[in-house]
Amino acid sequence: MFIKICGIKTPEELEIVENYGNATGVILECSSKRRIGFETAKNLVNLSNIPVFAVSTTSKVSVWENIIELTGTNYLQMHSDIDQKAIDFIKNEYGCFIMKSFKIPEKSESPENDAEKIISDIESYEVDRILLDTGKGCGQTHDHRISQIIAKKFEIVLAGGLDPDNVFEIVKVVNPFGVDVSSGVENNNSKDEELIKRFCENVKLGENYEM
């Protein structure tokens, strides 16, 4: 299963993440406490042996162009209502791999209806990967009855409040293509190798679980 460990800030964190994850991410141009500058991000992109996603809440093409040109990454993670025309321009101009986030409510009165609306939204976009999240890196879990329905139709990456203690059960229920974690594997605002190791072990247990 694809495992992305997001929100790295230092070469030391990158080194840990590379030992366990398939991809990582740097937070740029948003209000997150994990936000770093372009120079730091460029250094991490250059050092990395795995894909480094530039993560941002911007919907402005000019800002994405800055991110691409100043960091050198070819991987973008978009947490905004950016339109398809802008995405097409970025893909045609820069050839980037784009993962687009779609917001899932924390609790649903009607999971089937909510899933249907989100599926319709997803189908209005053409992107390389779909991310289901509770909303802009808030660190809260969402209603996994919805993501379970969506995961039967699309290859999705699951995010939102994942940690070593809950990821086994969530992966087992939702059966996503991949998972994306940040705060759930941190201790004192830094990536913790023991938490990352346990998280990845439990992802694999959930993936291989047979009813």
Curated annotation (Swiss-Prot):
E.C. designation(s): 5.3.1.24
GO biological process: L-tryptophan biosynthetic process
Keywords, ordered alphabetically: Amino-acid biosynthesis, Aromatic amino acid biosynthesis, Isomerase, Tryptophan biosynthesis
Catalytic reactions on record: N-(5-phospho-beta-D-ribosyl)anthranilate = 1-(2-carboxyphenylamino)-1-deoxy-D-ribulose 5-phosphate
Superkingdom of the organism of origin: Archaea
Pathway stated in the Swiss-Prot or TrEMBL entry: Amino-acid biosynthesis; L-tryptophan biosynthesis; L-tryptophan from chorismate: step 3/5
UniProt family annotation: Belongs to the TrpF family.
Protein name (record): N-(5'-phosphoribosyl)anthranilate isomerase
Taxonomic source organism: Methanococcus maripaludis (strain C6 / ATCC BAA-1332)
Gene this chain is encoded by: trpF
